[in-house]
């Protein structure tokens, strides 16, 4: 009996069992015991990223009307999300490029195919969003597969197209890894319909040199909005809900995984044996809490510090109108909330007291900026990258960042990890295209890459460094004969090695054209 048959028999036995209930994915056989890490770290990071973490933002309130038991929601500045969004903007923007080339020709068919795949999957925007969430939750994942349109009978209706999906850390669990490189994993795809939560558990694993993707389905009745969203529920037949989704897919002789786990730069100090990453604000949780407390206090300053005028209670009583109409009036505007009626001592019985206080806006803003400066240092930014003022609120720095800055070093460290994952993604796309026989303009991808290909990922660092200054520095180094033209073109101008070689050859050819050559061409006459 093959491993495949064993797996299918196991699925059949599951179908016969009526009591296959799983509280969460960590109760599945073969899943590492990461429940504590997700509950203590990833889920709180997600709550902070979304702007409501109950232990922080649901605070008790003591009032005369409700001396105990009342709560209110703490106002949040959401500095954690702002920090991750800024980090993602530094690392990834619309001028970043991914290329795959087989020749020096600018119209390389493989690169044209790759750009078409990226465009159809909205990669430029979607990857930026994923990068932001990855910085917040300590990890994320890309996944590639081929989508083949089916007719009503389940037959192929058109050629397949490569799809890329983008997954947060809460939708992904590694199951096998080597030196922090994840080799096998589970993806969780959850959908609510017909009164149930349906969760597809998608296993990516190896069977020798064969790459396998197997799908299981679980469902849980929807009981309310407050129930945990990570409950799997009862095992349920896949084909009853998703008849066109294959329970088992094999790719023989595969050379790469068809997903890439991406994580921020930095060690996992919470779990030494885990391949999972840490949020960029994992060591700044207390600071983020402090910024929210101060921001809430600033807002409450305007509520609690509003103008109040204390008047004698008897002055607020209604008396007959002096015009003799019999209507009742008050001496003060009863609809104006500035007045507070109190029963005063005899000495103050007729006094009207202005009880207004000065608003403490500047001390609050100074305190918030102090916390933001600490936050910047904790996540790898220069002080002032995040700041707060009374005009625009929380804002980010826009000036060019020097190469010697802390922010520059942090961004480059994150880019190195992302570059490796993006290169692996391109290899996965090419391998899927070969396996499914995909073509580009009449040529198979297998034929196009037969002689090999190169992958280049270019990050646009102009947002974090002065490009003109870098070019000037490179020219000086070349003039001093301590930097080659080829290295300058690759490192500073962003050329691929092939483009740099072609450009150097073109420059050499042009330099052979002398003034004498031009005179000969222009003024020579035939005899």
Which functions belong to the PLM regions below?
Residues 1-195:
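Extended, helix-rich architectural segments
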Residues 39, 43, 58-75, 343-378, ...:
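Extended, non-catalytic structural segments that build the interaction scaffolds
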Residues 128-137, 141-278:
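Extended, regular secondary-structure scaffolds
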Residues 241-403, 439-443, 458:
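Extended, charged amphipathic alpha-helical segments
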Residues 376-380, 427-438, 479, 493-497, ...:
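Hydrophobic alpha-helix feature that most strongly marks membrane-spanning transmembrane helices
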Residues 491-524:
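Long, highly charged low-complexity segments enriched in Glu/Asp and Lys/Arg with interspersed Ser/Thr
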Residues 424-454, 501-503:
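A glycine-biased, small/acidic residue-tolerant capping/turn segment at secondary-structure junctions
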């Amino acid at each position: 009996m093959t491993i495949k048959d064993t797996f299918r028999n196991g699925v059949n036995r599951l179908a016969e069992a009526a009591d296959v209930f799983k509280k969460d994915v960590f109760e599945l056989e073969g899943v590492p015991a990461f429940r504590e890490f997700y509950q203590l770290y990833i889920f709180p990071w997600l709550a902070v990223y979304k702007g409501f973490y109950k232990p922080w933002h649901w605070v008790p309130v003591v009032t005369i009307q409700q001396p105990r038991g009342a709560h209110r929601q703490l106002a949040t500045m959401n500095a954690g999300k702002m920090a991750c969004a800024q980090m993602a903007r530094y690392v990834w923007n619309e001028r970043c490029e991914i290329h795959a080339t087989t020749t020096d020709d600018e119209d390389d068919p493989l690169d044209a195919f790759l750009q078409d795949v990226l465009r159809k999957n909205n990669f430029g925007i979607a990857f930026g969003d994923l990068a932001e969430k990855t910085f917040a939750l300590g990890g994320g994942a890309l996944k590639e597969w081929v989508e083949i349109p089916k007719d009503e009978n389940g037959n192929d209706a058109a050629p397949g197209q490569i799809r890329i999906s983008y997954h947060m850390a809460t939708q992904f669990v590694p199951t096998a890894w080597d030196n922090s490189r994840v080799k096998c994993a589970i993806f969780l795809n959850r959908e609510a319909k017909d009164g149930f939560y349906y969760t597809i558990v998608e296993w990516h694993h190896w069977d020798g040199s064969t790459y396998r993707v197997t799908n299981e389905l679980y469902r849980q009745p929807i009981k309310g909005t407050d129930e945990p969203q990570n409950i799997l529920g009862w095992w349920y037949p896949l084909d009853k809900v998703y008849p066109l989704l294959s329970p088992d897919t094999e790719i023989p002789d595969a050379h790469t995984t068809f997903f890439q786990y991406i994580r921020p730069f930095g060690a996992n100090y919470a779990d030494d044996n885990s391949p999972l990453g840490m949020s960029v604000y994992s060591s700044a949780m207390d600071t983020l809490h402090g910024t929210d407390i101060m921001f809430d206090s600033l807002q409450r300053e305007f509520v609690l510090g509003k103008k109040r005028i204390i008047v004698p209670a008897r002055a607020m009583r209604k008396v007959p109108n002096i015009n003799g109409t019999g209507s009742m009036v008050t001496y003060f505007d009863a609809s104006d909330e500035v007045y507070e009626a109190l029963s005063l001592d005899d000495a103050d019985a007729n006094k009207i007291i202005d009880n207004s206080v000065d608003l403490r806006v500047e001390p609050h803003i100074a305190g918030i900026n102090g916390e933001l400066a600490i936050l910047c240092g904790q996540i790898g930014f220069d002080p002032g990258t995040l700041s707060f003022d009374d005009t625009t609120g929380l804002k980010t720095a826009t000036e060019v960042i020097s190469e010697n800055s802390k922010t520059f070093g942090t961004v480059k460290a994150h880019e190195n990890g992302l570059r490796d994952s993006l290169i692996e993604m391109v290899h996965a796309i090419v391998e899927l295209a070969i396996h499914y026989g995909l073509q580009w303009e009449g040529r198979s991808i297998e034929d196009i890459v037969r002689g090999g290909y190169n992958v280049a990922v270019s990050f646009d660092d102009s947002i974090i460094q002065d490009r003109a200054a870098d070019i000037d520095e490179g020219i000086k180094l070349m003039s001093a004969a301590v930097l080659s033209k080829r290295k300058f073109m690759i490192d500073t101008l962003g050329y691929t090695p092939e483009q740099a070689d072609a450009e150097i050859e073109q420059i050499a050819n042009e330099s052979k054209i002398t003034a004498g050559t031009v005179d000969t061409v222009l003024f020579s006459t035939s005899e």
